[in-house]
């Protein structure tokens, strides 16, 4: 009987831990509806990828940068954050890092910029002048 209780408790706590780090995906069409709200939009692609086209108002924090983890974790924990990358790999990893560090309101755009462009949404380009 005691083994059953202990195993049940371990299972319950394990499930709770897994759920606490679950990644919340949002469709690009749902993001369009909240785009002008108080969410901070973060593009975790490289600077070169960002320059080739990004969603309006996005902040670029390069996932591969040596300072990435310090930069992303410097955001206030109560910040509402929407993440995207090219397809979801880097943004999902970033969401996990944030969740593991106590951030609560994190969304990831399903399909990333690839899905965004595929569905005909506008992108901005970075231009440099000499």
Q: Where does each model-flagged region fall?
A:
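Rhodanese-like catalytic fold shared by cysteine-dependent sulfurtransferases
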Residues: 2-4, 15-39, 47-80, 86-130
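Hydrophobic membrane-targeting signal helices
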Residues: 8-14
């Amino acid at each position: 009987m005691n083994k059953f209780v202990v195993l049940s408790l371990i299972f319950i706590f394990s499930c709770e831990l897994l759920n606490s780090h679950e990644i919340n995906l949002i469709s690009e069409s749902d993001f369009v509806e909240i785009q002008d709200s108080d969410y901070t939009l973060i593009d975790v692609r490289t600077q070169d990828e960002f320059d080739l086209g990004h969603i309006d108002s996005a902040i670029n924090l390069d996932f591969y940068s040596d300072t990435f983890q310090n930069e992303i974790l410097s955001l206030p924990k109560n910040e509402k954050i929407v993440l995207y990358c090219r397809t979801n790999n880097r943004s999902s990893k970033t969401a996990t890092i944030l969740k593991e560090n106590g951030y609560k309101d994190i969304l990831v755009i399903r399909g990333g910029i690839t899905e965004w462009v595929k569905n005909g949404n506008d992108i901005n380009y970075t231009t440099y002048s000499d």
